[in-house]
């Protein structure tokens, strides 16, 4: 074959790729351009929130981070992100900041001040024009904790948790649509690590109660983090 097709001829052959920008195949889901904010390093404190920074706005959020988030056109932002989820109890992070408990962060070490909680993250999301996406604790958390969080965020008034939100200064419901059911529960490094069977049972029951509070929410289950390739089966 080399005698039939000289080296020079082979080397000169080129592939041509044509890109037709006028041909629309389908629309890309804007949520593909989402991200998550994690309580690790300076992801939260010193990152999106730093009241001592010269970039801080009146609520302590960094204006440069807000503007860059807008510039990147981040569509949806998950919180709390990562392993921190499995030890986080949302009621620690609401109400008077001076009365919020400081907890040991079992995921990453150090201490969690709870200065950024549900209402503060909603404030940041609104400023940055991103869709908030909350992830519930299915590691050390409970069914009640998950459904109460939906009540706090999405019920207008007249119940314990909706009225608690109003007492905390947020009369209108936050209307959080997207909710994740746990984080990397397949991994033994995770607080509350579960087998596929145990996770499925808890996720189904948690989803049921959450939807009884608000039927319009959208739920995202936790799949394998690639630790165990067969976990999803």
Task: Say what each PLM segment does.
Residues 10-232:
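Non-catalytic accessory regions flanking glycosidase/transglycosidase catalytic cores in CAZymes
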Residues 1-13:
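Bacterial Sec-dependent N-terminal signal peptides
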């Amino acid at each position: 074959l080399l005698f039939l097709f000289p080296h020079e001829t082979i080397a000169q052959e080129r592939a041509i790729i044509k890109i037709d920008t006028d041909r629309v195949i389908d629309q890309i889901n804007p949520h593909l351009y989402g991200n998550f904010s994690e309580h690790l390093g300076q992801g939260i404190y010193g990152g999106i929130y730093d009241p001592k920074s010269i970039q801080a706005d009146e609520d302590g959020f960094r204006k440069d981070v807000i503007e860059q988030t807008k510039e990147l056109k981040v569509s949806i932002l998950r919180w709390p992100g990562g392993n921190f989820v499995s030890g986080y109890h949302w009621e620690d992070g609401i109400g008077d900041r001076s009365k919020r408990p400081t907890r040991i962060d079992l995921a990453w070490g150090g201490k969690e001040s709870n200065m950024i909680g549900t209402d503060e993250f909603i404030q940041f999301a609104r400023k940055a024009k991103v869709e908030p996406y909350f992830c519930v604790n299915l590691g050390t958390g409970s069914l009640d904790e998950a459904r109460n969080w939906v009540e706090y965020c999405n019920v207008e008034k007249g119940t314990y948790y909706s009225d608690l939100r109003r007492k905390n200064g947020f009369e209108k419901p936050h209307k959080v649509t997207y909710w994740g059911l746990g984080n990397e529960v397949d991994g033994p490094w995770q607080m509350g690590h579960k087998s596929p069977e145990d996770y499925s049972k808890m996720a189904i029951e948690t989803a049921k109660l959450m939807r009884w509070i608000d039927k319009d929410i959208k739920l995202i289950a936790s799949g394998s983090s690639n630790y165990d390739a067969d976990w999803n089966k």
